[in-house]
Each structure stands twice: as C-alpha cells, then as structure tokens.
C-alpha cells in the first residue's frame, strides 16, 4: 500500500511540475519537434535521392515531401520505401525455393516439346522458367471463361464436386449474394469432411464482415487474412497486397484470372453494368503449380507447412493437353519483377501483333517504349481499356499515355458495353497471358500476382475471338480529336500521371 501511495505521489508531483512549467515546455517541445521533423524530412529526401530509383519516381517523392512535409513524411514511411529485399520477403523467397526443390523432378523443362516451338517462343518460356521456377506443361487442359456468370457457374459446380480439399486465395471477398453462395457451399463441404482453406487479403477484403468469417470458421473452414491491417498500427506491409485469385480443388481442377468474389463481378452493379472479365479453368499438370503457389502463400501467413504428396502428387493432375501452359507467380518476394519482364519479352519478340486488355494501364518507361517501337515497326498493337473510371486517378493517368501511343501508331480502344476488367496480352495469335496482373506499376513492383502463360492452345484461339468481339463493343480513340481535348482534361491527366509512381 505504501509503495502505491509513493507512486501516486510521484505522478502527482510530476503532473504539477509539468503544469507549472507548461509554457516553457510547450515552446521547447515545439521547437525541438520542428527541428527533429525537419531533419527527418531532409534525411528521407537524401535516402530517396541515393536509392537510385527511376528519376520520375525520385522526383515525385521529393516534390511530395517539399509540398506536403507532414503528410508526405508519413506517406513515405508507409508507401514509399522499397521492401522487396526486406528480411521478411527474402525469407519467403528462400523458403519458396526450398519448396520448389522438393518437387524438382516434376519441374524440369520438357526439352522435346520446347524444340517444337519457334526460337523466340523457346526463349520466352525459358525466361519464364528461370524467373518463375515453374516449367511449361503440355499435359494440361484449359478453358477461357469470358465473364462472371460463366466463371462462377463453373466454379460453383466444381466446388460442389470437391471430395478431399478446397483451397481458395482471393484479393476481394464480399458478404453479398455471391459471397453467401460460396460460403454455403464451403460450409456444406467442410461438414462432409472436405478440408477447406481460405486465404483472403487483409486490405482488399477489409469490408468483409466478422460474422461471415466466424460462420465459416465455426463450420471448420480455415479462414486466414493475408497481411491484415491492425489500426492504428500501420506498417509497410499495407502496400504489398495479395492480388492473386486462385482456386484449387482436390489438386485436379484449378481456376485463375481477374474475377474476385462479389455481386458486381456478375454485372449486378448499376454503375458498372456488365462486367467483362477473363478467367481460366485449368485441369491437369499445371494445377500442381497453382497448388504450390497457394501452399507457399499459406505457409508464409500461417507458418504451417503442408508441402507433401497428398497435395502435390503428379498422379493427381495428368491429362491430355492441346498446347503449353505455364503458371507464373510474381511479387515482392521474387528477386525479379517477373511479370513485367515476361510482358516485355512478349512485346519485344512479337512478329505480327500485340493485343492487350487492362483495366489499369500505367506502363513504366520500358513497356511504353517497347509498345511504341513495336507499332513504329509495323506490328499491329492494340490496347483495350475501360471507358469509365473504377479508380479515377488511375483512369486519368492511363489516358495521359494515349497521345504518344496513338502518334506511334498504337490503336487504343475504350470498351463501352460495361466495365472492362480483363487482364490479358496476346502475341501473334500464338502466345497469351491471362491472370491477375494489370499493365501497371503496382502489379509489376508491389502486388503478389499470378498469371497463366499459354502457347498454341485452343484457349489462345478463344482469346483472339473474344478480343475481336470486344472491339465490336468499343470505341477507337481518334488521335486528332483526342489531342484537341479540353485543357482541363489534360491538366487532370498530367497531374494523375505525375502521381502514378505513388499509386
């Protein structure tokens, strides 16, 4: 009791002393904090300058710090630092490589099949194997799914057929009609003894209700939030999001592509209307790679290691294929910016055509130059984007690239049937990529992404026909009219582009 009184007396005296000297302390603290804060801003400015980033990104951050020193200081601490080589991501990369080594025999390149490809196509898939560690599969069946209704008709049916396990990994999960349909099936399968693991992003799914998660957990579904954000304790991980959309069922059937879980992806949102997206159904050997990507992400977040033959056995996933399929993961845990380098390789190796669809088109200088050079060389370069904003700054930043692309001969189209959310690139009508990666800096440098690269499959032919159909529901941008757009539009676009390195 005596000790408690002494403690209370001490704090009472301390409070009294602070109250009496409040004027002096206030001026002293304000002055000290101002000096410390100014030195911190200068220190961060020096760090940015000597990081040897791209000059545009360096200049943008320095301008933000100069114009908004207080906000810019905290904004840089949260979003500006490059943590690709941080201890946490480096550890994941090492563990992923160990996981790859466990199935090394299953991951060797099929040299006989590669010899049937053209020289530049061989180089692309060797590069993908070098960067992404996964070989091309010629024992996989694929099917292109062209919108939410078709995609979820297949997904819901496949989930109902699950017998052993269901693995889901999503950026956005909504507690709405579609979300409830998924939930009810997962609960039913869990009660049947099917092992269900569900990994959802902590930022993309921040609106997901606690009741939704708890109902699934109570039924035995393992629900895990990827890098959850715990206010007010924000960390740099808020900037590195899991943008992947993966489903693996029994190690035999898989899905990957651009669609999240929500009613808007079925065209039920009044603003967006019809939601044009592209997803891929996969059956066969390539599913094992999707499985491995999921299990690595699961281990990263939970610490649970489940890399065994129960989930990765080759006997689970062999089927007859009609071409090559290669699943490639990209993210801050990889040494290289994998998808960016593969997109660049696809563009620079094109002989006849480059067709791109992306809802968020903010290319870096390398991709932008490659597209312009291709068009100037006589290659048919087409870019399909939305005609309405999903994210306004990104939408206006995208349009700022149109004049120089149009001048080089690139054909730019805006989709007018609804909202264009497909993330595809088709080269020479032979090679294509479908996945989660946008043609923007966030997908190239920050997000965890996954893409399927296809070679001479029936799915590539379907992508070509779908693209032609989409162009029939699009408006081609006229260069003469576009370059004479109002000054205010150009101002907004230029400002948005200036901020694009921060997006």
Curated annotation (Swiss-Prot):
Keyword check for Cytoplasm: no
Entry's Gene Ontology molecular function annotations: cardiolipin synthase activity
Localization, UniProt: Cell membrane
InterPro entries, alphabetized: Cardiolipin_synth_Firmi, Cardiolipin_synthase, CLS_N, PLD-like_dom, PLipase_D/transphosphatidylase
Catalysed conversion reaction: 2 a 1,2-diacyl-sn-glycero-3-phospho-(1'-sn-glycerol) = a cardiolipin + glycerol
Domain of life from the UniProt record: Bacteria
Membrane-topology descriptor: Multi-pass membrane protein
Keywords: Cell membrane, Lipid biosynthesis, Lipid metabolism, Membrane, Phospholipid biosynthesis, Phospholipid metabolism, Repeat, Transferase, Transmembrane, Transmembrane helix
Domain PLD phosphodiesterase as annotated: residue spans: 238-265, 416-443
EC number: 2.7.8.-
Cysteines engaged in disulfide bonds, as pairs: none
Active site, renumbered: 243, 245, 250, 421, 423, 428
Transmembrane region(s): 5-25, 30-50, 59-79
GO terms under biological process: cardiolipin biosynthetic process
GO cellular component terms, semicolon-separated: plasma membrane
Pfam family, one: PLDc_N
Family from the record: Belongs to the phospholipase D family. Cardiolipin synthase subfamily.
Role description: Catalyzes the reversible phosphatidyl group transfer from one phosphatidylglycerol molecule to another to form cardiolipin (CL) (diphosphatidylglycerol) and glycerol.
Annotated protein name in UniProt: Cardiolipin synthase
Native species: Alkalihalophilus pseudofirmus (strain ATCC BAA-2126 / JCM 17055 / OF4)
Lineage: Bacteria, Bacillati, Bacillota, Bacilli, Bacillales
Gene that this sequence comes from: cls
